[in-house]
Amino acid sequence: MKKHAFSLAILLLPLSALAVPPQQPVSEGIESPNYVWNADSGEKKEILKLKGNAERGKEAYRGCQGCHKPSGAGIPDGTYPQLAGQHASVVVKQIADTREGRRDNPKMFPFAGKHVVTPQEIADIAVYLQNMKIPRDNGKGPGTSLARAKDLYVKDCQSCHGENGEGNAAKFYPVLAGQHYKYLAREIRDIRDGKRRNANPKMVKVVKDYSNADAEAVADYMSRLLMPERSADK
């Protein structure tokens, strides 16, 4: 009797409850000799042609708030990155790379996949985030190796990411100012170890000889960079 009751209950469930969550696709990444970083093709190119609207983006961003928070601040422990103030071009590229399987992010894919978010909504969200003020209370490191970390940053990172961590929208180099220390350290290690499959090969060369201590030190320095004109009030 119990077996029949269970079978009936299963039949009465909505189809959505029985559906298998869509799996993130896999495309060629940096592990492939055919990999081209930031190729001018695919969904990224399509989205960048669209005109984003911040008001619509505010509404569409509601689906992101559970992890990245209404302020775009993410989580200080680095579980989820800080997005507020990020270049729209960078947001578009990273979402497109996730949707097309060049950046492995199984946690994000169910919320950002093509089955959930349209290209226009991505363009809108990207503009909305770019216009947000960068929070100042991001997660920071211990501050014990900042002099050495500054030397590393100036030598290896500043030419692309800027003196104040402002990045470069036209070149798709992300804003680092206000980003969480633990997130930055993890991403540097992943790029070094080949786990960040959509990494810029130039950056792989820069960090290939970094020790974990180097990665953590420079991440600590990056997390303290500040862009006063784009930062939230204290």
Give residue spans per PLM region.
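Generic signal for short, ordered secondary-structure residues
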Residues: Y35-V36, E43, R62, P70, ...
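The canonical Cys-X-X-Cys-His
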Residues: G57, C64-P70, I125, D156-E163, ...
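Axial heme c-ligation environment in periplasmic c-type cytochrome domains
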Residues: V20-V26, P76-Q82, T98-A123, L129-M132, ...
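Extracytoplasmic/secreted proteins, especially bacterial periplasmic and envelope-associated proteins
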Residues: G52, R56-E59, V90, K107, ...
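Electrostatic cytochrome c docking/interface patches
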Residues: Q24-Y61, P76, Q130-L152
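N-terminal export/targeting leaders of redox proteins
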Residues: M1-K49, S89, A96, S223-K234
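Gly/Gly-Pro-rich "capping" loops immediately C-terminal to redox-active cysteine motifs
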Residues: A54, K69, A73-E100, G113, ...
